[in-house]
Amino acid sequence: MQEPGTPTEPDPAPITFERNPDDYLHWDLTFDPPIAYLSMNVDPGGATLGDYELKLNSYDIGVDIELASAVRRIRLEHPEVRCVVLMSAIQGTFCAGANIRMLAASSHAHKVNFCKFTNETRLEIEEASARSGLRFLAAINGACSGGGYELAMACDHLLLVDDSASAVSLPELPLLGVLPGTGGLTRLTDKRHVRRDRADMFATKPEGVRGREAVEWGLVDELAPISDFDESVRQRALALAATSDRDADAEPIMVPEMDPTIDGDTHRYRNVTAEHDRPNRSIDVTVHSDARPDWPLRTALELDDLLCHLRFNEPSVATIVLHARGSIDDVLAHDDQLANPANHAARETSLLWARVLSRLDLTARSLIATIEPGSCFAGILAELSLAADRTYMLEGTFEDDADHLPAAEVLLTPVNTGPMPMANGITRLRSRLWGDDTAHGEALDAVGQRLDAEAAESLGLV
């Protein structure tokens, strides 16, 4: 028991998720269109959470936040880039994976959210290639183990230096007695189609596999001699860039600063507000509609920043109550560009929304949506109510409402029928009505109709 008057340890500073490339501590980002070079150069003394040393390009959450920032900025701000080379600035070392001392000292909640965040970043790399035409090349110039190999496997092509020493490995099982935590085994078998017996053997070899054997087993795609490694990387990157459909002449989308205002228990962005109800371990998150052209991009970025903040800095929050306030017409003004993106800006904004909604799905809190007079759960914001575990809609109006707001309505649009898939590849509408094809068909027939509470309930939407 602590004696009265004994100084207490200050609460750790909250983890923040906005990063400017000029302030990156662990990554060097350079451009030689159509190629961007993203070089891992982890500062050993730049730990985010403690006094552990980030040796051998090992990473913690701060390193991966910068990686996520770099990938997002390349996608949005640099349409001229068609291939990203992930590489290392440390000779003989690509990446040693997640820092073991950091993991040992972290809470269980942090470990879970850390692994979840890092995998979401790798999923974004894969999605950028599959849906945005941005290719990724892993230039493996040295030892590549654990999470480092998981990062490399997220790329389209793995080029390993052939120096008789550099190897790829997943040493978690033999050295730590745990399975790889960021999709390593799944990518090994389901993505790279490594034969099962080889995958089993690989996962028990802490020294890993190198050279021609790594190519034969399908662990990497190509070898390059150390004397010609840099040129081999460039030529392979150019070949990958040639397969991209990105519009090099498109207007860049500059990432705005979020700059949230925090006043006690209120977290306020321009379009998103969060208010804590700490006694009940809940938080009210309100998305406000706006007809301004930058609303879709900015709102997605704000909601994403808030979700990351809640995951890492607010572990006591058990329930997120979702609100959407404003005009349905304002939301619909952005609907077509999200459902049918016709240019770089629209495509990247639509894909960003899909990723943010997936992060909401996987945030591991109870989600409740409340649809009331003044709500605007339509189109992209209807995805919030479809993501919720429980959705409640007020029938009629509040008797004591001084503003005399009209009764709440819900409106499904083409955005809700395919462009925003969940992580499992199906829509939230299909997931909500899973196993009932008749109900799903009736909901699709109601696309474009403004639904009151009775109609929404009859369709299974609330």
Description of each model-found segment:
Residues 49-50, 57, 301:
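ABC transporter nucleotide-binding domains
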Residues 113:
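Active-site-proximal segments of catalytic enzyme domains
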Residues 1-47, 150-154, 193-295, 331, ...:
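Amphipathic alpha-helical segments at domain termini/boundaries
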Residues 169-200, 208-212:
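Mobile "lid/hinge" segments at catalytic clefts and subdomain interfaces of large enzymes
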Residues 105-106, 171-174, 186, 198-200, ...:
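Short beta-alpha connecting loops at secondary-structure transitions
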Residues 33-40, 60-109, 119-139, 161-165, ...:
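A structural preference for short, pocket-lining loop segments at secondary-structure junctions
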Residues 73, 120, 187, 213, ...:
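Alpha-helical scaffold segments in soluble metabolic enzymes
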Residues 89-90, 125-176, 202-203, 207-208, ...:
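Glycine-rich beta-to-alpha active-site loop
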